[in-house]
């Protein structure tokens, strides 16, 4: 039964056996932080602290896509009527896992709580962060046409 604080979960459509979920975090850097400092913190401080914990909880892949002013400027070469709105996020972080429970258990880990929750406040504008989750459907991998995500 659904409540106002916990709505009823809708049924997942299609077959999701042997599929992976991708949590996408669209993040902004903390006010006053340069792109270089943000990138440095994400790659050289946050990632080393996080990646082994993710492996411990069955995370399959974690990537960061850094969306700096220089790379956003490349969009001028790709603009067309269908690709005209450029996202202004500083980073897209994508976490791939098979079961949402794995990610939830990782976030409940005492080490995560002690070290990573507070670290996010050192570099991220967490009030502006946007998140979404969806199934991965893969069609090209390493320059080859494929029919699905490799598990």
UniProtKB/Swiss-Prot annotation:
One GO molecular-function entry: lyase activity
Catalysis: reaction(s): atrochrysone carboxylate + H(+) = atrochrysone + CO2
Keywords: Lyase
Domain (EthD) ranges: 31-126
Gene3D superfamilies listed in its UniProt record: 3.30.70.100
EC numbers, comma separated: 4.1.1.-
Presence of keyword Lyase: yes
Pathway: Secondary metabolite biosynthesis
Enzyme class: lyase
Function: Decarboxylase; part of the gene cluster that mediates the biosynthesis of the tetrahydroxanthone dimer neosartorin, which exhibits antibacterial activity. The two different monomeric units appear to be synthesized by the same set of enzymes, among which the Baeyer-Villiger monooxygenase nsrF is the key enzyme for the divergence of the biosynthetic routes. The pathway begins with the synthesis of atrochrysone thioester by the polyketide synthase nsrB. The atrochrysone carboxyl ACP thioesterase nsrC then breaks the thioester bond and releases the atrochrysone carboxylic acid from AacuL.
Family: Belongs to the tpcK family.
Annotated protein name in UniProt: Decarboxylase nsrE
Organism name: Aspergillus novofumigatus (strain IBT 16806)
């Amino acid at each position: 039964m659904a409540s106002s604080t916990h709505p009823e979960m809708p049924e997942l459509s299609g077959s999701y056996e042997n599929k992976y979920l991708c949590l996408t975090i669209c993040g902004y850097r903390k006010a006053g932080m340069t792109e270089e400092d943000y990138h440095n913190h994400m790659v050289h401080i946050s990632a080393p602290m996080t990646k082994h914990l993710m492996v411990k909880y069955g995370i399959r892949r974690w990537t960061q896509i850094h969306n700096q002013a220089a790379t956003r400027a490349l969009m001028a070469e790709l603009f067309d009527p269908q690709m005209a709105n450029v996202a202004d996020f500083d980073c897209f972080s994508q976490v791939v896992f098979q079961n949402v429970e794995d990610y939830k258990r990782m976030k409940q880990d005492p080490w995560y709580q002690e070290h990573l929750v507070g670290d996010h406040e050192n570099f991220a504008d967490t009030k502006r962060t946007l998140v979404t989750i969806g199934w991965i459907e893969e069609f090209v991998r390493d320059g080859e046409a494929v029919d699905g995500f490799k598990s």
